[in-house]
Amino acid sequence: MTDFRPADMAAGGKGAPLVPFLDYFLYRDPQFARIAQNIGGIANLTGIPPGASPLQLVAFDTGPGNMVIDAVMEELFQKRFDRDGEVAGSGRVLNAVVAKLLRARFFRQTPPRTAGREEFGREYVGRFLQTCHGASKPDVVATATALTARSIAAALHTFVLPRFAAKAAPARSEQKVCQLIVSGGGTKNATLMAMLRNEVAPLGIDLHFSDEFGLPAEAKEAVAFALLAHETWHRRPSNVPSATGAKRAAILGKISYA
């Protein structure tokens, strides 16, 4: 089975993201509001209000995941990534730089939205390094790491939690009923996880890892496309129009016989 995106695009969608169908399948709950946050090169989320239907999901790219951090590490240390977040953990965040970067148009754009190397690739990293000019190398890595954590928290605060508020039960409105379930390679960065936990705690959000729910952090995409293939085989739609912008549900993928 191949080509899962064209059917959604034919229905007016962007053909992405497709993983929200798995998030809904795994994490929907009648009582808890849950946010599935994947941190790969790009960070993306699926917001699932308590008792939600597929049409009530919100899903979009929050901004850079590991992409900027990895590029900065390669440029400054000739290393592919910041193992365990050790370099970031030894630096200090340039808060003024992060605040300036978060004022960019992308972070203010209302979902659905997608990001890639066009937004956060080499050109962006070059400008980022120039903005951090004069800072120590660990401080620059710490700042790149904070950008990922704070852009996720900002997206939650601005675009996700307001939707959850309307669904929250009055009796539990002051309790921590929102769970952030994190997956992807970013979960291996201890400093990033600590920063993210600190950023979302004031929002009333508890941080969890997908492993706690039976999904290994690095297996999410493989499981997602296995589920999409299963739905295609049974001729059931598996796009999420509220995430992709499609005008209708669609059966995704093509079946090819050898």
Segments from the language model and where they lie:
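Glycine-rich phosphate-binding loop plus the immediately following alpha-helix
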Residues: 1-24, 35, 39-108
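A glycine-rich, Thr/Ser-enriched phosphate-binding loop motif common to dinucleotide/cofactor-binding enzymes
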Residues: 12-21, 141-151, 221
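Catalytic phosphate/nucleotide-handling subdomain of diverse soluble enzymes
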Residues: 49-51, 62, 71, 150-164, ...
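A polyampholytic, Gly/Pro-enriched intrinsically disordered region
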Residues: 15-27, 80-83, 224-239
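Glycine/Thr-rich phosphate-binding loops that ligate phosphate moieties of nucleotide
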Residues: 113-130, 134, 138, 211-213, ...
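A contiguous, well-structured pocket-lining segment that forms one wall/lid of small-molecule binding clefts
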Residues: 79-81, 85-164, 175-178, 190-205
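Ala/Thr-enriched low-complexity intrinsically disordered regions
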Residues: 165-171
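A short glycine/serine-rich beta->alpha loop
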Residues: 6-13, 57-59, 135-139, 209-217
